Amino acid sequence: MAESEKEAALPPKEEFSDWYNELLWMAEIMDVRYPVKGLYVWYPFGFAIRRSTYNIIREILDNSGHQETLFPLLIPENEFMKEAEHIKGFENEVYWVTHGGKDSLDIPLALRPTSETAIYPMYKMWVRSHADFPIKLYQIVNTFRYETKHTRPLIRLREITSFKEAHTVHATWEDAEAQVKEAVELYTEIYRRLAVPVLRSRRPDWDKFPGADYTDAIDAMMPDGRTLQIGTVHHLGDNFAKTFDIKYEAPDGEQRYAHQTCYGISERSIAATISIHGDDKGLVLPPEIAPVQVVIIPIIFKKGAEEVLAACRDVQERLKKTGVKVEIDASDLRPGAKYYRWEMKGVPLRLEIGPRDLENNVAVSVRRDTGEKEQIPLPEIETGVLQKFEAIQNSLYEKAKVGLESRIFDCTELEEVKEKIQKGVATIPWCGKKECGLAMEDRIGAGILGIPLTPRGKGKEKCPVCGAETETRVYVARTY
């Protein structure tokens, strides 16, 4: 490896924080040098990953009856302050616009931290009858929160550049509950497409979304054993409907308050994907979101160079016709330097074609995730590449799933939990009482994620705080 390449080597992934920060700029995901804390710039390569990721999100939502929309960024203070419990959760994080030019505004305007108070005044005007339901809208927007904690690109931001928020309206509490369940499944499907296995749980009441009846959440296990919240789904009951006077005419002619849900997902989805799959060489991307899915490396010698380049161009055109995003690296860099470059960018599949390969009418494929080499006959290159993509996708998911499950530890004592959460997620019996939950968090030094949506109970057990019998276990973890 050349000296310049040594200088550009990533820290090992086991040094996760340094690895993550270096990878973001070495793979050209984000530039962190913007002169405002917590605001970052997408490189074109990173933005292409973002675009493909959000295309998946749009596809899954659109196919389940959601419609995309767009609401304003600015929220009048009088609307923003209507929902007291909701505002209590955000009041210290709001950016306020107080002037237009040199003139003071009569009503200050909030930069949305989230859009309930922007959308629900419009729902009051739009909702008329039970026949209007369900309303299932979503938007993908930037949101702003004055984070005072340590910011980290894609994970903790002052400007969330890619916030997908859905807001639904229903006739009954039960209809809204069914929508929550659907949303959890949709998010699970989104992450399955990203080859990211998830933990699904119901947050404890003290950690639910401000103003919600309850919150279900999706978490990913990061390489350092901490969990990252990568999706939330909130049952709002009729709380916001009462605040914003969202009523409908029921079949019996009575006016009733609507019931609502909201659910969000952000660029943390990308943070989880690159963190879980990446390795010491750089990104390892699922084929569906890779800006370059195949890179063709011509193996050039003086003799037969034109024939090799012509064959590479032919393969490129054939793959493009099947929808594959493919590049040829015919630069003057030596092959090892080319491999380094494209491995850093996580290109799922490398094809090498040289004079000997042409004689045998094959291309040599090299998988980014495993390094496995295999010949693909050139007449079958299209089907061969697509089969490799499917194998890579399945392999990434299964590897991540095994990794997640191997780091979930069922515990019975709080001291054991303190030890195990240094490696991953612990489960522990809990009676359900708030005072016991808070005492547990205090003694463990970590938070209760929530009650698994797929129960992990082992029959009757005892709460480690009060000794009461319970069949419920909760996830406990260190979190981002």
Curated annotation (Swiss-Prot):
<keyword id="KW-0648">Protein biosynthesis</keyword>
<dbReference type="InterPro" id="IPR036621">
    <property type="entry name" value="Anticodon-bd_dom_sf"/>
</dbReference>
<dbReference type="GO" id="GO:0005524">
    <property type="term" value="F:ATP binding"/>
</dbReference>
<dbReference type="InterPro" id="IPR045864">
    <property type="entry name" value="aa-tRNA-synth_II/BPL/LPL"/>
</dbReference>
<comment type="function">
    <text>Catalyzes the attachment of proline to tRNA(Pro) in a two-step reaction: proline is first activated by ATP to form Pro-AMP and then transferred to the acceptor end of tRNA(Pro).</text>
</comment>
<keyword id="KW-0067">ATP-binding</keyword>
<dbReference type="Pfam" id="PF03129">
    <property type="entry name" value="HGTP_anticodon"/>
</dbReference>
<protein>
    <recommendedName>
        <fullName>Proline--tRNA ligase</fullName>
        <ecNumber>6.1.1.15</ecNumber>
    </recommendedName>
</protein>
<dbReference type="InterPro" id="IPR017449">
    <property type="entry name" value="Pro-tRNA_synth_II"/>
</dbReference>
<dbReference type="Pfam" id="PF00587">
    <property type="entry name" value="tRNA-synt_2b"/>
</dbReference>
<dbReference type="GO" id="GO:0004827">
    <property type="term" value="F:proline-tRNA ligase activity"/>
</dbReference>
<dbReference type="InterPro" id="IPR006195">
    <property type="entry name" value="aa-tRNA-synth_II"/>
</dbReference>
<keyword id="KW-0030">Aminoacyl-tRNA synthetase</keyword>
<dbReference type="InterPro" id="IPR016061">
    <property type="entry name" value="Pro-tRNA_ligase_II_C"/>
</dbReference>
<dbReference type="GO" id="GO:0005737">
    <property type="term" value="C:cytoplasm"/>
</dbReference>
<dbReference type="InterPro" id="IPR033721">
    <property type="entry name" value="ProRS_core_arch_euk"/>
</dbReference>
<dbReference type="Pfam" id="PF09180">
    <property type="entry name" value="ProRS-C_1"/>
</dbReference>
<dbReference type="InterPro" id="IPR002314">
    <property type="entry name" value="aa-tRNA-synt_IIb"/>
</dbReference>
<dbReference type="GO" id="GO:0006433">
    <property type="term" value="P:prolyl-tRNA aminoacylation"/>
</dbReference>
<keyword id="KW-0963">Cytoplasm</keyword>
<keyword id="KW-0436">Ligase</keyword>
<keyword id="KW-0547">Nucleotide-binding</keyword>
<comment type="similarity">
    <text>Belongs to the class-II aminoacyl-tRNA synthetase family. ProS type 3 subfamily.</text>
</comment>
<dbReference type="InterPro" id="IPR002316">
    <property type="entry name" value="Pro-tRNA-ligase_IIa"/>
</dbReference>
<dbReference type="InterPro" id="IPR004499">
    <property type="entry name" value="Pro-tRNA-ligase_IIa_arc-type"/>
</dbReference>
<comment type="subunit">
    <text>Homodimer.</text>
</comment>
<dbReference type="InterPro" id="IPR004154">
    <property type="entry name" value="Anticodon-bd"/>
</dbReference>
